[in-house]
Swiss-Prot record:
Group of enzyme by EC: hydrolase
Subunit record text: Monomer.
Sequence similarity: Belongs to the HAD-like hydrolase superfamily. MasA/MtnC family.
Required cofactor(s): Mg(2+)
Protein source organism: Pseudomonas aeruginosa (strain ATCC 15692 / DSM 22644 / CIP 104116 / JCM 14847 / LMG 12228 / 1C / PRS 101 / PAO1)
Keyword Flavoprotein found: no
Keyword Amino-acid biosynthesis assigned: yes
Catalytic activity, as annotated: 5-methylsulfanyl-2,3-dioxopentyl phosphate + H2O = 1,2-dihydroxy-5-(methylsulfanyl)pent-1-en-3-one + phosphate
Protein name (record): Enolase-phosphatase E1
Pathway terms, separated by semicolons: Amino-acid biosynthesis; L-methionine biosynthesis via salvage pathway; L-methionine from S-methyl-5-thio-alpha-D-ribose 1-phosphate: step 3/6; Amino-acid biosynthesis; L-methionine biosynthesis via salvage pathway; L-methionine from S-methyl-5-thio-alpha-D-ribose 1-phosphate: step 4/6
Length: 249
C-alpha cells in the first residue's frame, strides 16, 4: 500500500527532548502556580482543576493543594491529561508574550515541508496536549509551521504505548493503518503502532537502533533505506536522511 500520511512524535523526533525538559517543563513549573491562582475561577481552568481532584482522589483539595499535586506530577513526568492541559495554557501565555519559541530541528522543518509538498498528510501524536503541540509548531523558531499539519492527537486518543490508540487514530484520520507511517524515538511506541498495522520508522538522533524497526541514526555508516529493506530513494532529514517509501509493497 502507498504511504499517504505521516504520524509523528515530537520529543526526540521533530524536536529536542532537552527543549521539553530544560525549557518547557521548568517554565510551566515556575509559572503554573500563579497562573492557577489567577485563573482558577475561569471555566476552562476550573474544569481542569476538577479533573486533577478526580484523578488524584482528593475531591476536597483546595487550590493550593491542587497546585502541589500538579507540581508533584511535573516532577514525576506524569502524563496526566489535566496537567498537560494546564501546562498548555501556561505555555500559550508564554508564547503570546514572546518568552517561548518552539524548537523544531532544521532537518525536520525541511522534511515536513517536502513531505507536505509531495502530497502527504501530516499528523502529530504526542503526550503533550493538542494545544501545546500547536504552539510548538505554530510559534517555532522557524516560524509558523502549523499549516503543514492536518491534525493533532494527544493522550485523549489513548496511551502512546497501546496499539488500540493507533487503531483509533487511524480511524480518525480515515485511512487504513498500513497507509500511515509513524515516526518515534521510543521502541514501545513503535511496537504499538506496528501492532495496529502502521508502518514505522525509529529515529535515534544520538545513534544506535530501535529493535525491530527500521531506524535512522544521526551518523549512519551506510544507506539506511537499503538496511531497512526499502528500494532506492531518500528524502534528507538533515544528516539522518529518513525516507518515506512511495509504496509499502
Amino acid at each position: 500500500m502507498t504511504i499517504k500520511a505521516i504520524l509523528t512524535d515530537i520529543e526526540g523526533t521533530t524536536s529536542a527532548v532537552s527543549f521539553v525538559f530544560d525549557v518547557l517543563f521548568p517554565y510551566a513549573a515556575r509559572h503554573l502556580p500563579d497562573f492557577v491562582r489567577e485563573h482558577a475561577g475561569e471555566t476552562e481552568v476550573a474544569a481542569q482543576l476538577a479533573a486533577v481532584r478526580a484523578e488524584s482522589g482528593e475531591a476536597d483539595a483546595d487550590v493550593e493543594r491542587v497546585i502541589a499535586i500538579l507540581l508533584q506530577w511535573i516532577a514525576e513526568d506524569r502524563k496526566a491529561t489535566p496537567l498537560k492541559a494546564l501546562q498548555g495554557m501556561v505555555w500559550a501565555q508564554g508564547y503570546r508574550d514572546g518568552q517561548l519559541k518552539g524548537h523544531v530541528y532544521p532537518d525536520a522543518v525541511q522534511a515536513l515541508r517536502e513531505w507536505k509538498a509531495r502530497g502527504l498528510d501530516l499528523y502529530v501524536y504526542s503526550s503533550g496536549s493538542i494545544q501545546a503541540q500547536k504552539l510548538i509548531f505554530g510559534c517555532s523558531e522557524a516560524g509558523d509551521l502549523g499549516s503543514l499539519f492536518s491534525g493533532y492527537f494527544d493522550t485523549t486518543s489513548g496511551p502512546k504505548r497501546e496499539s488500540a490508540s493507533y487503531a483509533r487514530i487511524a480511524g480518525a484520520i480515515g485511512l487504513p493503518a498500513a497507509e500511515i507511517l509513524f515516526l518515534s524515538d521510543v521502541v514501545q511506541e513503535l511496537d504499538a503502532a506496528r501492532d495496529a498495522g502502521m508502518r514505522t520508522l525509529g529515529l535515534a538522533r544520538e545513534g544506535g537502533s530501535l529493535d525491530g524497526h527500521p531506524t535512522v541514526a544521526s551518523s549512519p555508516t551506510s544507506s539506511w533505506s537499503e538496511r531497512a529493506g526499502y528500494p532506492e530513494g531518500t528524502l534528507l532529514l538533515g544528516s539522518i536522511a529518513p525516507w518515506v517509501p512511495p509504496s509499502a509493497g
